[in-house]
Amino acid sequence: MKLIFIHGSGGSKEAWRYQVEHFPSAEAIDLPGHPRGKPCTSVDGYVEWLRNYIHERGYSKVILAGNSLGGGIVLLYALKYPGDLKGIITIGSGARLRVHPMYLTQLEEAIKNAKLLEEFLEKRWELIAPELKEVMRRRAFENGPVVFLNDYLCCDKFDIIARLGEIRVPTLAICGSQDIMTRPNTPTTLPATSGEQER
């Protein structure tokens, strides 16, 4: 069995530092373009990249865990390639990941003025442990606002609500009561609509 953690928009594998320390066989990955390589322009593109990554390494009985954009990748992977998986975990994510236009505008402005990216991130990272926050901040600036905007646009286009009932792999959905992007009382945070699904 292999447990793989997938970060959210503009993020990095460092976001999963404590989880990787806790689960010895776990692995956290950087999505392409974060910062090496070229970012994918859709959730589906990230799914195909991830499948190649998994198959190249010969992993089997994989459990995928993803936050935000990473959760969307996990859900779509479960729909497309359920035979690769032992289970999935979504954290602060959902089957539809609409992004408020204000956030997209802020990121467009941050491309012109890097200082605005710091302001954009600071509001979202208030609850992160200080020692981890600094590492994530450094990695976020390595990725840059163009990658953040790309990932948020991927999220904004993502919508698989109509297909949730097709997911047949064991599923755990986790939501935070103080998550400012994905509210726990939003129906789309549930990765399954069928009563046969594990939640």
What kind of feature is each model-predicted range?
Residues L75, L79-K80, L85-K115, C154:
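Flexible "cap/lid" loop of the alpha/beta hydrolase fold
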Residues P187-R199:
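Catalytic histidine neighborhood in serine/cysteine hydrolases
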Residues G66-G70, V74:
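Gly/Ala-rich beta-loop-alpha elbow adjacent to hydrolase catalytic centers
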Residues G45-V62:
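Conserved acidic catalytic loop of the alpha/beta-hydrolase fold
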Residues R98-P101, K115-E166:
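Conserved alpha/beta-hydrolase catalytic His-Asp/Glu region
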Residues M1-K38, V43:
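Conserved HGGG/HGGXW glycine-rich cap/lid loop of the alpha/beta-hydrolase fold
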Residues I167, A173-C175, D179:
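Short beta-strand/loop motif that positions the catalytic acidic residue
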Residues I180-T186:
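Conserved alpha/beta-hydrolase "acid-adjacent" motif
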